[in-house]
């Protein structure tokens, strides 16, 4: 599976995926170029219509995966794993110490995937999702807290 770095302006297909993972438009905008010129977007599929994509931003000693999403009909084909493994490789090649990712504590499948890939639970941001303009319901539960996970080299 080829992972490609995307450095052009994002189109509607990109935004559909980004908002699938994080429905707060203003929050997503803040961690993407041009507001965050250091953000990197990686995708699998076609540039104009990706099957899966992720956004990684630099943080102290590492990278944080701020957003990762796969088209619903393309799930369970290893694309999210491929994207995460690519970000891990990029971080390792740059000599960084770790990669971080956060998700709702109600995101059971995502947590299972991240732990399978070697991420360890690192903390909880209490009430993080309660600041969103619309409630997020996942697996029949209201998303309130964000679980942070880290992969250390």
What are these regions (language model features)?
Residues 70, 76-91, 116:
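Conserved acetyl-CoA-binding loop-helix of GNAT-fold acetyltransferases
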């Amino acid at each position: 599976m080829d992972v490609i770095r995307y450095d052009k302006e994002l189109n509607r297909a990109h935004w559909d995926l980004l908002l699938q993972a994080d429905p707060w438009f203003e929050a997503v905008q803040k961690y993407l170029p041009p507001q965050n010129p250091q953000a990197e977007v990686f995708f699998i599929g076609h540039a104009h219509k990706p099957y899966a994509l992720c956004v990684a931003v630099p943080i102290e000693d590492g990278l944080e995966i701020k957003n990762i999403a796969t088209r619903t009909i393309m799930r369970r084909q290893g694309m999210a794993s491929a994207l995460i493994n690519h970000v891990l490789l990029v971080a390792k090649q740059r000599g960084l110490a770790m990669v971080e990712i956060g998700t709702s504590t109600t995101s059971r499948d995502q947590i299972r995937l991240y732990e399978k890939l070697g991420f360890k639970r690192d903390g909880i941001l209490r009430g993080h999702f309660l600041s969103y303009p619309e409630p997020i319901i996942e697996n029949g539960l209201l998303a309130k807290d964000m679980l942070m996970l880290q992969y250390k080299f």
